[in-house]
Amino acid sequence: MNEINRSPDLEMVVLKEISSAIVNERNGTALLRHILDVLYRRMKMLRGTFTIRRGNDLMIEASHGLDEQEMKRGHYHVGEGITGHVAETGRPHVIEDISRDSRFLNRTRTRKSGEKVAFICVPIIHLQQVIGTLSIDRAVDRDTDLERDQKLLEIVGNIVGDALAASLQAHEERAALVAENEKLRELLTTNPGELIGNCSTMLQVYDCLLYTSPSPRD
């Protein structure tokens, strides 16, 4: 159950908790999940996602209220739907009722038909570049102030830019390492001479690798 804080100090409470998480959490993705948990407890957030930009694509990096399959479906092109539009323009967007807006794609398929909730999406900017988005589905009642919520999310997006950038860099470094390892493995398998030459020590290492490698029947 959301522990909604109705006081005028809502923003300060949220930002204090998020700032504490940034100081104490070193894992980028875990930090993003922690931030979404804060928004859930404090803002009547039903679902929330951080997307990360890779080239012309946006992929969900962290979420609250989505399962693994729903996260995998949350794949957008820059410029596509509300999330893609925010990533393309660098400007926030608010939909007061997603059931009445045809631009809302519901790509994750988490929203029920006719479900009346608001959707707020803000860009995450690092070094003047949009590197991702933060979006939430929010229940709406007579006390809801969507403009206030948007401004708060923009502040959150600004202060987590470094964390999302670090997560993006880690993804890129892992991908580069995997590609390099695959290239090295292919060379060792198909043309070891290019790497080993006539060095007797390297020849011994290569013989050891071949000896310990599993056979195709294993």
Name each region found by the language model.
Residues 117-125:
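A short, aliphatic-rich beta-strand micro-motif
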Residues 32, 185-218:
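AAA+ ATPase active-site-proximal loops
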Residues 2-7, 138-154:
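Regulatory loop-to-helix N-cap segments in sensory/regulatory domains
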Residues 69-93:
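Acidic/proline- and glycine-rich, intrinsically disordered low-complexity segments
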Residues 59, 68-70, 96-118:
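Signal-transducing coupling segments at domain and membrane junctions
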Residues 164-195:
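Conserved ASCE P-loop NTPase core motifs with emphasis on AAA+ ATPases
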Residues 14, 126, 144-163:
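Amphipathic alpha-helical "output/dimerization" segments
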Residues 1-30, 41, 61-62, 176-186:
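Signal-transmission linkers at sensory-effector interfaces
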